[in-house]
């Protein structure tokens, strides 16, 4: 847990340099995958959460974590104690953002759906807050021992294994 607390401290310091109050990160990557490769497990690096569905909103003063009922027990076990954990079935994420008054939230918008970013941005505007697009993912910049991306050759499945030839799917 000491490593995770150190990762959080590094992020807090970077947030100050970016003049942002919060950083918003999820389990998904820039391809919006739910199950991401090790080198894109940004949420796990920051919070120690290893589930496939979660959002963290972190600042130097307050840390919030959102997940669904499948992962509540896991989140309580894996996250540092300074996180307040919410059940997404009971807490509306968009409304939560509306409660952030006069704040700025840094986010890599490539790692979220366009609709979610629009909804969060509207919600923040209602409370005189703003969303800041992180052009270069902040965690990628500070994650010094990030696993190497595995580049593998693609292969074509035989028709009997997938039902249709790949040419028919193009």
Give the ranges of each region predicted by the language model.
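Nucleotide donor/acceptor-binding cores
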Residues: 102-104
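N-terminal accessory/capping or targeting/presequence segment of soluble
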Residues: 1-99, 108, 112, 116-170
């Amino acid at each position: 847990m000491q490593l995770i607390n150190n990762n959080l401290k590094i992020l807090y310091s970077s947030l100050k340099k970016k003049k942002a109050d919060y950083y918003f990160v999820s389990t998904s990557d820039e391809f919006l995958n739910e199950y991401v490769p090790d080198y894109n497990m940004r949420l796990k690096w920051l919070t120690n959460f290893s589930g496939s569905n979660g959002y963290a909103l972190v600042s130097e003063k307050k840390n919030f974590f959102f997940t669904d009922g499948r992962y509540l027990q896991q989140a309580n076990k894996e996250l540092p104690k300074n996180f307040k954990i919410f059940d997404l079935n009971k807490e509306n994420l968009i409304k939560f953002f509306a409660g952030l008054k006069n704040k700025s939230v840094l986010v890599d918008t490539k790692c979220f759906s366009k609709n979610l970013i629009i909804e969060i941005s509207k919600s923040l505007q209602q409370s005189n807050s703003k969303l800041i697009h992180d052009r270069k993912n902040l965690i990628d910049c500070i994650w010094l021992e990030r696993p190497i991306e595995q580049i593998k050759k693609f292969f074509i499945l035989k028709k009997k294994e997938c039902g249709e030839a790949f040419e028919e799917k193009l």
